[in-house]
Amino acid sequence: MKSIDYVNPVKNQVPKVGFVSLGCPKALVDSERILTQLRVEGYDIVPSYDAADVVVVNTCGFIDSAVTESLDAIGEAMNANGKVIVTGCLGKRPEQIREAYPQVLAVSGPQDYQSVMEAVHAALPPRHDPFVDLVPDYGIKLTPRHYAYLKISEGCNHRCSFCIIPSMRGDLVSRPVDEVLCEAERLVRGGVKELLVVSQDTSAYGVDLKYAERPWRDRMYQTRMKALCEGLSELGVWTRLHYVYPYPHVDDVLPLMAEGKLLPYLDIPFQHASPRILKLMKRPGAVEKTLQRVQRWKAMCPEITVRSTFIVGFPGETDAEFESLLDFLDQAQLDRVGAFAYSPVHGASANALPDPVPEEVKQERLARFMAKQAEISALRLEAKIGSVQQCLVDLIEDDIAVARSRADAPEIDGLVHIQNGGELGLKVGDLVDVEITDSDEHDLFGDALPANVVPQQGRALNLQMV
């Protein structure tokens, strides 16, 4: 009997879009929203330039290296495909993009979803796809199924001298609290076990809406950080706060952390420890109060993890001011720290500051800073040996499960290597208690306690992107 290869005529006609997503988690959420709308309208998302009828590049433009990466990605897409639509933060500088690549089809700024869709429609009209109902109600995700970024606002009201985010993303615009909670609920129904709350300034959430009340689950919630956290705690999953500005009312969420309703984790960028440098940065400069608050947070919630970021080599930074930054690390005993050497950002007011620090000095200071924090991190992780940590499995590698504890955000913090993960048959998305047996400067090592595994349910939606 002769076999017949069935060809779906509708599928062959489906317009195909390639997608490149660059930048921070907030840009990743923008990409997820565009991809979801593309699928709802019947476009197929393909993992290569060759298979695509048109390519969308979501760019980053925060620092010079990100601009270079974005321009390189646009060039790669132009060379491989030729039909390219550009969006994202670098899209706020269309002249820079068109000077390099005058043949791009369209350029739009961040979170301008309508302009992206209009450009796609112009280049590639949508066609009916009977399978679009298969798009899950939580949309298309670019993260693994067990965690998701939850963006609560756009833009920022601050004018830090080293930052150009407001010029690219505008002033703060908060999403209504019920809209955010409904999205979180959909994500949890889809299998998400960790919600990572992101914005440019999470602490200021709702100030532009005058903290308006909105209904969700038969009660009223203010559009405010604490009320949002109270609502998210009702969903029974990990909730992690990122990009928290050091306002006094941050203390309001500490009781939720102490009660186990919110992950005991604060991501607060302090940026420096010199009052003069902080003033030049246009950041809060009460360093002694900052140290007091860190100690108060630890007293209120002993399990809290405090992550922060810093800039070394800011214009005018003296040797003494850098030493004060190292002293701050010693006193604050932060758990997780990131740092980078200052570099001028196109359009930032800090570019006009006098007394730039020589590049070799910046790099030497950065190395000393990271070495100091590595010592602190190693001691703080060593203190966890013998404890039991709840962990979320991210990856299975040979016989080892690679997970994160409640103290570790994806991609930026440490890992927990579960030595008996393969033996126990752990899977990505499982929640498991792990007895810690060893540590190094960044990671923990241990064995899972088999009686305390919460398995991941359902099946993941696998979507491979360019």
Curated annotation (Swiss-Prot):
Subcellular localization: Cytoplasm
Main location, first listed in the record: cytoplasm
SMART domains referenced in this protein's UniProt entry, alphabetically: Elp3 (SM00729)
Binding residues annotated for [4Fe-4S] cluster 2, in chain numbering: C156, C160, C163
EC number: 2.8.4.4
Name by which UniProt lists this protein: Ribosomal protein uS12 methylthiotransferase RimO
Any Pfam family hit: TRAM_2
Domain TRAM, first and last residues per copy: 382-450
Sites where the protein binds [4Fe-4S] cluster 1: C24, C60, C89
NCBIfam families named among the record's database cross-references: 30S ribosomal protein S12 methylthiotransferase RimO, MiaB/RimO family radical SAM methylthiotransferase
Source organism of this protein record: Xanthomonas oryzae pv. oryzae (strain KACC10331 / KXO85)
Keywords tagged on the record: 4Fe-4S, Cytoplasm, Iron, Iron-sulfur, Metal-binding, S-adenosyl-L-methionine, Transferase
InterPro entries: Elp3/MiaA/NifB-like_rSAM, Methylthiotransferase, Methylthiotransferase_CS, Methylthiotransferase_N, Methylthiotransferase_N_sf, NA-bd_OB-fold, Ribosomal_uS12_MeSTrfase_RimO, rSAM
Reactions performed catalytically: L-aspartate(89)-[ribosomal protein uS12]-hydrogen + (sulfur carrier)-SH + AH2 + 2 S-adenosyl-L-methionine = 3-methylsulfanyl-L-aspartate(89)-[ribosomal protein uS12]-hydrogen + (sulfur carrier)-H + 5'-deoxyadenosine + L-methionine + A + S-adenosyl-L-homocysteine + 2 H(+)
